[in-house]
Structures are given as structure tokens and as C-alpha cells.
Design a protein with these regions (language model features):
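N-terminal cap/lid subdomain of alpha/beta-hydrolase-fold enzymes
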Residues: 1-47, 52-55, 67, 104-105
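Gly/Ser-rich "nucleophile elbow"/oxyanion-hole loop immediately N-terminal to the catalytic nucleophile
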Residues: 2-8, 63-72, 78-105
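Accessory cap/linker subdomain of secreted extracellular hydrolases
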Residues: 25-44, 59, 73, 85, ...
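Catalytic nucleophile-loop/oxyanion-hole region of alpha/beta-hydrolase
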Residues: 57-78, 247-257
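Short beta-strand/loop motif that positions the catalytic acidic residue
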Residues: 197, 203-205, 209
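Short alpha-helix in the alpha/beta-hydrolase fold that links the catalytic acid
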Residues: 199, 213-223, 373
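Catalytic histidine neighborhood in serine/cysteine hydrolases
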Residues: 224-244
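C-terminal, loop-rich substrate-recognition/catalytic regions characterized by aromatic stacking residues
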Residues: 252-443
Length: 443
């Protein structure tokens, strides 16, 4: 804010989410349940801020390609070159500005698919690892979320690669993606591109995000740490993201995300000391809004105790019946109308009436952080491709994380055993708390 003539500053790039225009109000402040910094936060911290409309959206030309490294990725590299030559940017060298990236969702994915070595640090929020896995996990298409995304793109007048619409149509109508559609989604990375990421990376992912759930950030972090570069990686799980936090929100959640983001940029972009050293390696908020930290990421050896929380059940008969007594949609006058109206209401997992239930009674004080493992044996006859697994918090009646896990089944009359990792959760057991595992016929 307020550079004098001849002064220079480090640069932060802030691409927007899908269906959103670049932010142009320099005084915009961070709101509740926010996953990142606002323009005012960045400028007040002493950074030049660059925002833009991604290709195919709003004032930009071209055709939207879903953060493809050969299209949107090259656009970002061109912006970095422009920042070096045409703005009052501090430089590391010729055509190499001191630059970091912040932003969420579509604006988080592009940070990992650009893979420009000039980028000094990234803070991808509520982003994906694999669009195929995120949008069609276990070959079960997320029809509600596809509808939300399609309406956002159409409402914004986006000009889109027609193969993307084709995939949405076949997914919605037939729960099927062609090889072409899968290839288009695969081209949006980051997956294999993560092997090239050297920029220090701080992930911010939502515990109640049913579009890009926690496992997407976990996979990204694992991939970057497997590189030989020694890249610093830290992670925050907050109550928010795609969807809505129905649980209590810690009053310091947003301010922590903002201060951590600025500290990350200060350390790795501006080079003003090492405030990022004080950021916990892993921090998360549980279902009651309580803040926790760890020196280990949730997938690293030593994070979990050797003896896990376990529960077993005797099973029963489950009918796979579309629409009736399944998981979702979200209902209730206590919630904002925007999340209880079609199609957003359909994106929430809820306690189901048609379900097999297994009691889970962990010890008070236990923390269940990560992906529960589920295994069961079944047989059946029918045309269904999957059942759904979810954990219900008996204290609130809500599904932990608002999220269910599709479990692929083969209903050929023979006995099968299936084992899956459920959606990651962050749950602390208090006095009187318990869970119910539900195996649900429809979500």
C-alpha cells in the first residue's frame, strides 16, 4: 500500500475461484469461513497484488481449459514475466520477480499446475490432486457438485472447452465419463506435475469440503515431500471450503490463516526473516472448533497411535434405493437458505434412514484425525455400483465432515470383501460423544 516513486515491492498473485472474476477492490477484507487472504491483507503486508480473470471467463479471451498447464499455466507464467518488466516489482534476477501465489479452489489448482521455477512460494487452498478422483471417486460421479459448477460457469458466461460440458452431461445422465473426458480432467493435474514443485508449499484445506476433500491435500503433500528437493510443506485443516461449516467455527480460525499466509510469503518471497518457522507443521480444527497442532503431518510415521480405535458390526440387509431415505439433502431452518436450497443442499451428506448402523465408541480424549479404514464382506444382486459410508456424530446428528465415501460393490450374487479408506476427518471425543458408522444405499 502506498509505494513511493522508485520504490519496489515483492509480488503476490491471487487467481480467483472457478466462475469468479479476479478481485479488483483493493480494500476488500477477509470474511468469515475464509480460506485465504484478502487484497487488503496482502497489500497492507507490503506486497504488490496481481489478480486476473482466467482464460475463458469474464474479461479474458480464449477458452477455459481447467487450469491446464499448457494454457492457464502458461498464462500465469506470462503474468509473472509482465510483473518483472512492467510493475514496480522487487527482482531476484532478470525476468525473475520475488513472487508468491495465494488463492483457493480453481485459484489453488493453478498454483500447482503452473510449475514455473520463478515462483518462490505457494499457498494453495481447497484445491485438488486429481480431478478424476475428486469429481468421480471410485467411478461414482458427484452429480450435485457438477450441477453447482455447471451453473456457476453458465451464469458467468464462461467460454469452455466443449469436452468439459460433454463430461458433465454423461456424468449427470449416466454416471459415466468417457476416456476423452477423463483425459481432459487428467490434463488439469496436478498429479504428476507435483514431481516438479520446488516452491515452499502451505496447504489450506477444508474439513467440511465435499468437492475437494481433505485427501486431495494429503495426496499433494505426500507427492511434494517425496521429491528430492527438500521442499518445506505445512498444512492447515479448517472448518470451511466448498460447502458450509455447520459446526462451531473457532473465532481465531480466519485470522490464523491470514497471519500464517503472510508469514509464509514474508519468509519465502520477501525474505524478511523466518516467521514461517513458527507455523505448526500441521494444524487443524475439530468438530467443536477446538484448535490442535502437531509437528507431524497426518500421514507421517508417529502421528497415529499404534493401536487404532476399532468397531465391528454384524451387518444386515441393505436395499440400494435411489432418493428414498438416503444421505442428503441438507434440511433445517437453522441453516442458511443458500445451503438448504437445490442444488447446494444435495452436496451435503446427512444421517440416513436406509442404512446399516455400527456403533463406534472411542475413549474420551481420543482424537480421530485422518482417514478411517473400512472393510466389510457382502453379497447381493442388482444394478447398483456403490454404497456409501459415513460417520454420524451422535451428539449433533450431523455427518462428520458433511461427507460420505462411495464404496464400489459388485452385485453378482457372490460374496465379496471390500476395503477402502473413508474420507479424512478431524474429530475429538468429549464426554458423552460417540459415532455411528452408516453404510448407506444412496447419497
Amino acid at each position: 500500500t502506498g509505494l513511493a516513486a522508485g520504490e519496489e515491492a515483492p509480488t503476490a498473485l491471487n487467481p480467483p475461484g472457478l466462475g469468479q472474476a479476479g478481485r479488483t477492490n483493493p480494500y476488500e477484507k477477509t470474511g468469515a469461513q475464509s480460506y485465504g487472504v484478502s487484497p487488503a491483507d496482502v497489500r497492507d503486508a507490503g506486497y504488490n497484488l496481481i489478480t486476473w480473470d482466467p482464460r475463458g471467463e469474464f474479461a479474458s479471451g480464449g477458452v477455459l481449459q481447467l487450469d491446464n498447464p499448457f494454457f492457464e499455466g502458461r498464462d500465469t507464467s506470462a503474468i509473472i514475466s509482465w510483473a518483472a518488466s512492467d510493475t514496480p516489482a522487487e527482482l531476484n534476477g532478470m525476468d525473475d520477480p520475488k513472487v508468491g501465489m495465494v488463492g483457493g479452489s480453481y485459484g489453488g489448482g493453478i498454483q500447482m499446475t503452473t510449475v514455473d521455477p520463478r515462483i518462490d512460494a505457494i499457498v494453495p487452498s481447497i484445491a485438488w490432486n486429481s480431478l478424476n478422483e475428486a469429481l468421480s471417486p471410485s467411478d461414482v460421479f458427484k452429480s450435485a457438485w457438477a450441477t453447482v459448477l455447471a451453473l456457476a460457469l453458465v451464469g458467468g458466461g464462461a467460454r469452455i472447452n466443449t469436452q468439459i460440458y460433454e463430461g458433465m452431461a454423461t456424468g449427470l445422465l449416466f454416471n459415466w465419463l468417457s476416456q476423452t473426458s477423463e483425459a481432459v480432467l487428467s490434463s488439469s493435474g496436478p498429479t504428476a506435475l507435483l514431481s516438479k514443485v520446488e516452491a515452499p508449499t502451505m496447504f489450506v484445506q477444508g474439513t467440511v469440503d465435499a468437492l475437494f476433500p481433505l485427501n486431495q491435500a494429503v495426496a499433494n503433500a505426500e507427492a511434494i515431500l517425496a521429491n528430492p528437493f527438500g521442499t518445506p510443506v505445512k498444512m492447515t485443516w479448517f472448518c470451511g471450503g466448498h460447502g458450509y461449516c455447520l459446526d462451531p467455527v473457532n473465532p481465531l480460525q480466519t485470522s490464523r490463516i491470514v497471519s500464517n499466509t503472510i508469514a509464509w510469503l514474508d519468509t519465502y518471497v520477501a525474505g524478511t526473516g523466518d516467521p514461517a518457522e513458527d507455523i505448526p507443521v500441521f494444524q487443524w480444527y475439530d468438530q467443536k472448533g477446538v484448535y490442535h497442532t502437531s509437528d507431524l503431518l497426518p500421514f507421517q510415521t508417529g502421528f497415529n497411535q499404534a493401536t487404532p480405535v476399532t468397531a465391528t458390526g454384524t451387518g444386515g440387509t441393505l436395499g440400494i434405493i435411489p432418493f428414498i431415505a438416503g444421505s442428503g439433502p441438507l434440511q433445517g431452518a437453522q441453516y442458511p437458505s443458500g445451503v438448504t436450497s437445490w442444488p447446494m443442499a444435495q452436496t451435503f451428506a446427512t444421517e440416513a434412514g436406509n442404512a446399516l448402523n455400527v456403533a463406534v465408541t472411542p475413549t474420551v480424549g481420543d482424537q480421530i484425525v485422518g482417514a478411517p479404514a473400512l472393510s466389510f464382506t457382502y453379497n447381493g444382486v442388482g444394478t447398483g455400483k456403490a454404497v456409501f459410508a459415513e460417520l454420524v456424530d451422535n451428539a449433533t446428528g450431523r455427518v462428520v465432515g458433511n461427507n460420505s465415501t462411495p464404496v464400489p460393490v459388485t452385485l453378482d450374487g457372490r460374496e465379496h470383501t471390500v476395503s477402502v479408506s473413508m474420507q479424512d476427518i478431524a474429530y475429538t471425543v468429549g464426554a458423552g460423544d460417540s459415532l455411528t458408522l452408516q453404510i448407506v444405499g444412496y447419497s
